[in-house]
Amino acid sequence: VFSALKDWLNDGNSARSFACDEDDAAIIATAELLSLKPIIYAANLDEDGFADCHSNAYYKIVEELAAREGAQVIPVCAKLEAEIAELDGDEKKMFLDDLGIAQSGLDRLIQASYALLGLISFLTSGEDECRAWTIKKGTKAPQAAGKIHTDFERGFIRAEVVNFDDLMAC
């Protein structure tokens, strides 16, 4: 299997796109090849090409590459992202509305990264602080509590769960 993979890689392909059965995939995974890692492409576009990125010839090339690898492309405009970073919540929302987009490229990139890696965040809140914790999707509440402190996992009693959108609506 490694011989076939070597030929595949020498032809300029990534290990991610190498077709094989589950047993061979498990063997190949032991090599810990960088090109086996999941990938997201961030396409930096200028302000003019950002609104209609699918008509941009360079973006199409990146899309085709990503499609061959089963990857996702996130269009971003670094100049707009820099402007967005300087704005507060209400100004940011108005700016994004004027651009006709719901989220900044950075927010979309973060969400896509979390999804690709199978991660979610949960929030804890107390009198002094509110904090976000990153865990694997599907982690049970006691194990999530253990991320904060191992004593919390051992003495876990219950979790009070609120949907993020419901929390933001308050």
Predicted segment positions?
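C-terminal-of-GTPase-core extension/linker across diverse P-loop GTPases
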Residues: V1-C170
